[in-house]
C-alpha cells in the first residue's frame, strides 16, 4: 500500500448516492471564462453566471471531488447540483450566507 492510497471494491461507485439533486441551466454572461470547483457553494459563484440563484442555495456541483466545470464567455450549459451535506452551515465564499442554510 502507498501512503494516502485508497483501496476500493471492484465495480462502479455512485457519487453522492441518496442525496437531493437539482438541474439548472447556467449562462456565462461575462467576457471571461469562469471555472467552478466541485465543492464551491453554487449560490455564491461568480455573478457573471446567470441562473436561478435561489434554487442553488445549499447546493454544489455534482461532480467528483477535486474537479471543476468551466463556463466559457457566452456559453450556456445544464449542470446538476447536489445538496451540501453535514451540518449545512456555510461560511466564506462571497460571504452571502455566513451561517446555517
Swiss-Prot record:
It comes from the Bacteria. The keyword Cytoplasm applies. Keywords: Cytoplasm, Hydrolase. GO terms for cellular component: urease complex. The keyword Protease does not apply. Pfam families: Urease_beta (PF00699). Belongs to the urease beta subunit family. Heterotrimer of UreA (gamma), UreB (beta) and UreC (alpha) subunits. Three heterotrimers associate to form the active enzyme. This is Urease subunit beta. It comes from Burkholderia multivorans (strain ATCC 17616 / 249).
